[in-house]
Amino acid sequence: MTEQELIKAALAEDLAGGVDITSQATIAADATSVADFVARMDGVIAGINIAHAVLAEVGLTDVTLFKKDGDQVKVGDVLITVRGNTRAILLAERTALNFFGHLSGIATLTSKWVAAVSGTKCQVRDTRKTTPGMRTIEKYAVRMGGGTNHRMNLSDAALIKDNHIAAAGGVVAAFTQVRSAYPKAEIEIEVDNLAQLKEVLPQQPDLVLLDNMSPELCAQAVALAKGTCKLEASGGISIASARAYAQSGVDYIAIGALTHSAPVFDIGLDLRAE
């Protein structure tokens, strides 16, 4: 889904009954207010432009952005100020905060992983473990936190995993079938042990995914590969162990948690009279 489609769908979800009955009952139709979006915690933000687009979608045009995506913010920082119709502000509030808080949570978590491997050549990469319909914006948030994107979709590159290997009859068989069918595609192949790595290296893969290997085994894999392909560690990696994996010499660590387990970044909306 496009960003605009997501916004329209989210607002429609809130107005499924046709009207905000609380605002309708308590706020005059022509009432105006000023509202500030305020950071309730420290972190890295993403989604400020989406929050802005939500406000625009309900007709709010007097909007000031004080920060930009990728900025480090602190508790109490005012991120956005909006002036306009009070009912419209409250209609947009939850949808804007949902997007803004979710994406800033991803950016903030990603920045912590990136900090954990700082000073090494290792990059933190995301996965396709994203919220259905929100992959593009979630992967954008990863970039804002300093991370790197893996595939956006199944056509971007080949990633031969254990089920493909089982179906094809082995590591080499799976690789050669993909290479034959898509000779120009980037191919990454998953291996569970060093024996599989030794088997696939002569096929000259672009990348090899080291699945659930310890940092020590990853270091051995790096020595075996001798720089002939990129190596990515995946599975069983915590933020506490990330540096050990990075220091093993792998090029990437794949972290599904960046998008599937990021806590929401706390942002509040404070309304005040005009």
Residue ranges and their predicted role:
Residues 239:
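Cys/His-rich Zn2+-binding cysteine-cluster or related metal-binding knuckle/ribbon modules and their
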Residues 1-203, 207, 216-224, 230-232, ...:
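Acidic/glycine-rich phosphate/pyrophosphate-binding loops and surrounding catalytic core
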Residues 212, 235, 257-258:
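Short secondary-structure boundary segments
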Residues 234-235, 253, 270:
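Cytosolic regulatory modules rich in charged/polar residues
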